[in-house]
């Protein structure tokens, strides 16, 4: 397949500064993510995210990330921030995830413990989350948070998925080209790979990351 006919979507997650969000829009990033998971160093309050949301460019999705938050907390974020997409990293089931009447992504932990001790299985995932807009495969272990800066073995990705998937976990400008060529994801999700410190993005790393994604898109796979 000629990658010039395909565009990998890009999501920058863990945003905490309006200036970083504006730069993401200028770079053509498809989505920015705010983290509301307890214990995350990138966690922001709903009011902070609402203020930063004003910096998003037109046609850029605003993603709200949760990990075992209560239904009331998710509802407050939906009401206050007005995200266009939800992302769940905990033990939330499909009924919970779809109860907010917004499209959602379900994160799948691919850390050393795998998914319940086993590799992810496409059929099981799709039966468990029939209403998800897509899956996100990250390197964290079950019950842990993302943004670890660690990769996982990409050969363990399940085959036969009928939903789009995003690749996350330790992706940066140095390896995103190889990651895309190896796995052909719908999109890539990066946080620590474009940071100086948790939540503090680096403009040079952001630009370089986008350049490498576009280079991969132009790579001839034939």
Curated annotation (Swiss-Prot):
Any matching Pfam family: PRAI
GO MF annotation: an example: phosphoribosylanthranilate isomerase activity
Catalytic activity: N-(5-phospho-beta-D-ribosyl)anthranilate = 1-(2-carboxyphenylamino)-1-deoxy-D-ribulose 5-phosphate
Pathway of action: Amino-acid biosynthesis; L-tryptophan biosynthesis; L-tryptophan from chorismate: step 3/5
Origin superkingdom: Bacteria
Enzyme Commission number: 5.3.1.24
Keywords, ordered alphabetically: Amino-acid biosynthesis, Aromatic amino acid biosynthesis, Isomerase, Tryptophan biosynthesis
GO process annotations (BP): L-tryptophan biosynthetic process
Record PANTHER family: N-(5'-PHOSPHORIBOSYL)ANTHRANILATE ISOMERASE
HAMAP family: PRAI (MF_00135)
Family according to the record: Belongs to the TrpF family.
Name the UniProt record assigns to this protein: N-(5'-phosphoribosyl)anthranilate isomerase
Organism: Xanthomonas euvesicatoria pv. vesicatoria (strain 85-10) (Xanthomonas campestris pv. vesicatoria)
């Amino acid at each position: 397949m000629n990658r010039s006919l395909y565009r990998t979507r890009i999501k920058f997650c863990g945003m905490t500064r309006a200036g970083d969000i504006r730069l993401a829009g200028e770079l053509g990033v498809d989505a920015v993510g705010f983290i509301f998971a307890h214990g995350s160093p990138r966690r922001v309050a709903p009011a902070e995210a609402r203020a930063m949301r004003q910096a998003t460019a037109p046609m850029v999705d605003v993603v709200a990330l949760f990990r075992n938050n209560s239904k009331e907390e998710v509802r407050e974020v939906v009401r206050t921030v007005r995200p266009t997409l939800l992302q769940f990293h905990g033990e939330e089931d499909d009924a919970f995830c779809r109860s907010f009447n917004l499209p959602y992504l379900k994160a799948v932990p691919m850390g050393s413990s795998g998914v319940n001790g086993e590799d992810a299985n496409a059929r099981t995932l799709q039966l468990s989350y029939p209403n998800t807009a897509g899956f996100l495969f990250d390197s964290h272990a079950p019950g842990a948070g993302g943004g670890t800066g660690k990769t996982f073995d990409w050969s363990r990705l399940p085959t036969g998925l009928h939903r789009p998937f995003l690749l996350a976990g330790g992706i940066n400008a140095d390896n995103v080209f190889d990651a895309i060529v190896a796995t052909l994801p719908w999109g890539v999700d990066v946080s620590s790979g474009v940071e100086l410190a948790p939540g503090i993005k680096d403009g040079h790393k952001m630009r370089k990351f986008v350049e490498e994604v576009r280079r991969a898109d132009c790579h001839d796979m034939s």
